[in-house]
Amino acid sequence: MGAPKLKWTPEEETALKAGVLKHGTGKWRTILSDPVYSTILKSRSNVDLKDKWRNISVTALWGSRKKAKLALKRTPLSGSRQDDNATAITIVSLANGDVGGQQIDAPSPPAGSCEPPRPSTSVDKIILEAITSLKRPFGPDGKSILMYIEENFKMQPDMKRLVTSRLKYLTNVGTLVKKKHKYRISQNYMAEGEGQRSPQLLLEGNKENTPKPEENGVKNLTKSQVGGEVMIMGMTEKEAAAAAARAVAEAEFAMAEAEEAAREADKAEAEAEAAHIFAKAAMKAVKYRMHSQTR
């Protein structure tokens, strides 16, 4: 048996996150040799840093260890250095929102590049933008929406599946209307505005319109203050947690349905291709027989 693994301290986690932001993911040896972090991470190896960063990444993005294990199986390992750096900034922001007591500000993307869309909320906005911009009489189909997103945004490896899932979700909640495989924005959504938007869009809209603490002098709320705010809104913390759990369950159900639909579409496409090949072979056989009979 090897030596027991030491539990990571908050100082070590902070040093790892700061090191990844400074040097990039995969630069474990560089982080360990950096004099700023070497003292704090002296008891850690390259493998320790790699494993811990993987746990931080997936847990921050998926929210639980069970979902993290599924995500590790599905998440592609390929990606450019620029994508890795942008992902690292997002992960650290999701994990704790600060490094060394300072707010993390994502660097501006270089000229000529598109910032990769963030999950769910930004994808919903991109889908609505695509439908509005394409200006089809009865609305664009899913393929046209995907093509628009591919042409105007940097597509992540799993973006196609996510867009399919969000199209189904937005249809279920009434934001979109689907008819004969074409999507259009519902009249209720356009007429009632914010009241009919999906919870994700409302949350992001509120977040964007909220001034930063340093701009209006408002301090960050403590846990007790947050609990008080929840109570004022008419929900206890337990009710809020239950509502959040239901939202997560609905999102997972929608994702599962989207994956099943994608599998069925792939199967139908394969069957159609096989039928096409069979038809071509049959035509060749008929032509050969007719040619033989004319001799």
UniProtKB/Swiss-Prot annotation:
Subcellular localization: Nucleus; Nucleus, Nucleolus; Chromosome
GO biological process, one term: nucleosome assembly
Free-text domain note: HTH myb-type domain confers double-stranded telomeric DNA-binding while the H15 domain is involved in non-specific DNA-protein interaction and multimerization.
Any coiled-coil regions, as ranges: 239-277
Family as reported in the entry's similarity comment: Belongs to the histone H1/H5 family. SMH subfamily.
InterPro entries: Histone_H1/H5_H15 (IPR005818), Homeodomain-like_sf (IPR009057), Myb_dom (IPR017930), SANT/Myb (IPR001005), SMH1-6 (IPR044597), WH-like_DNA-bd_sf (IPR036388), WH_DNA-bd_sf (IPR036390)
Residues covered by region (Disordered): 100-120, 191-220
Source species: Arabidopsis thaliana (Mouse-ear cress)
Alphabetical list of SMART domains matching this protein: H15, SANT
Residue ranges the UniProt entry marks as DNA-binding: 28-57
Tissue localization of expression: Ubiquitous.
Compositionally skewed regions (Basic and acidic residues) per UniProt: 205-217
Primary localisation category: nucleus
Record domain H15: where: 119-187
Domain HTH myb-type per the UniProt entry, residue ranges: 1-61
A GO molecular function held by the record: double-stranded telomeric DNA binding
Function according to Swiss-Prot or TrEMBL: Binds preferentially double-stranded telomeric repeats, but it can also bind to the single G-rich telomeric strand.
Keyword terms: Chromosome, Coiled coil, DNA-binding, Nucleus, Transcription, Transcription regulation
Lineage per the UniProt record: Eukaryota, Viridiplantae, Streptophyta, Embryophyta, Tracheophyta
Name of the molecule in the record: Telomere repeat-binding factor 3
Name of the encoding gene: TRB3
Subunit structure as annotated in this protein's UniProt entry: Forms a homodimer or heterodimers with TRB1 or TRB2. Interacts with TRB1 and TRB2.
Cellular component, GO annotation: chromatin; nucleolus; nucleosome; nucleus
